[in-house]
A protein has these predicted regions:
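N-terminal basic, Ser/Thr-rich segments that initiate or prime the first beta/alpha elements at protein or domain
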Residues: 1-147
């Protein structure tokens, strides 16, 4: 598991990382397909476009971090086009697991957070999404018990 540089950089004083999550290997299938098509069609412009798309996909995958601290849900996707998630735990209304047939077969899914005043945010293509959802719900329950 790689170090979560972005998540560490968002920590407040005395804030602790509880869990970090990695992307499922399935995200690399798109990269491989883009590379294959790009290399096969390289003599023409479309090949270059596919190779550039593959590079952008690699940078996006490498730039993705997801985690939960004792105070918030935090995440970052992308490298060039970046999207940050910073959602206070006390603002989360629901945690939804979105997993299609391929996700169930291969063990990946999307975790969607509905927050007050923030709309929907989520972790896409996470490994073992049921475990992720259960861990997040447990943290939310622990916070409710402390109130």
């Amino acid at each position: 598991m790689k170090e979560k540089v972005f998540i560490n950089s968002t920590l407040a004083k005395n804030e602790k990382i509880l869990f970090t999550y990695d992307l499922h290997w399935i995200v690399w299938v798109r990269v491989v397909l883009l590379l294959i098509v790009g290399l096969l069609t390289l003599p023409i412009l479309i090949g270059v476009i596919f190779l550039i798309a593959a590079i952008f996909s690699i940078l996006s995958i490498k730039g993705t971090e997801y985690g939960i601290t004792d105070k918030k849900i935090v995440g970052k996707t992308g490298f060039i086009f970046r999207r940050n998630i910073d959602l206070r735990l006390n603002k989360i209304e629901s945690v939804i697991l979105d997993q299609g047939i391929f996700g169930r077969m291969f063990g990946y899914g999307h975790i969607v957070f509905n927050g007050t005043g923030s709309g929907k945010n989520g972790f896409l293509f996470v490994q073992n999404p049921m475990l992720v959802k259960n861990q997040i719900n447990q943290v939310l329950e622990d916070i409710e018990e402390k109130k």
